[in-house]
């Protein structure tokens, strides 16, 4: 049974401009330590960050909170399985809310084109 659905879109150029203004501080606000390692290795840091931003916003919307009520960007970690499928791991307040909602499955899709990155998150329980 679907208990949460969230979608977000991020303009890559806008994220690149924020990076140019604020540098690593902007990335640190959005990314976990493990994601920061990947960010530093990325040749397209603005695109990388826009995709993570959209995914985390989509996840927070699926939980029903947005980035508020104690839920922060650091409560969400994006990684990939061996085949490249995106995975979403929850921690902190986001994990607490997911437990209360009895979330058993999290589905994440991330896509990007020239100007935009977008993500959709579906939360399921049995």
From Swiss-Prot:
The residues listed in the UniProt record as binding Mg(2+), with positions renumbered to this chain, are: 8, 57
**Where's it mainly located?**
cytoplasm
Q: A GO term (biological process) for this protein?
A: fatty acid biosynthetic process
A Gene Ontology cellular component where this protein is annotated is: cytosol
Localization per Swiss-Prot or TrEMBL: Cytoplasm
Query: In which domain of life is the source organism classified?
Result: Bacteria
**What's its job?**
Transfers the 4'-phosphopantetheine moiety from coenzyme A to a Ser of acyl-carrier-protein.
Q: Which UniProt keywords apply?
A: Cytoplasm, Fatty acid biosynthesis, Fatty acid metabolism, Lipid biosynthesis, Lipid metabolism, Magnesium, Metal-binding, Transferase
Keyword Magnesium attached: yes
Which reaction(s) does its UniProt entry say it catalyses?
apo-[ACP] + CoA = holo-[ACP] + adenosine 3',5'-bisphosphate + H(+)
Family annotation (Pfam families)? ACPS
Q: Which cofactor names does the annotation list? A: Mg(2+)
Put simply, this protein is called Holo-[acyl-carrier-protein] synthase
EC number from the UniProt entry: 2.7.8.7
Q: Which GO terms describe its molecular function?
A: holo-[acyl-carrier-protein] synthase activity; magnesium ion binding
Q: Which HAMAP family match?
A: AcpS
Q: Which family does it belong to?
A: Belongs to the P-Pant transferase superfamily. AcpS family.
SUPFAM superfamilies found in the cross-reference section = 4'-phosphopantetheinyl transferase
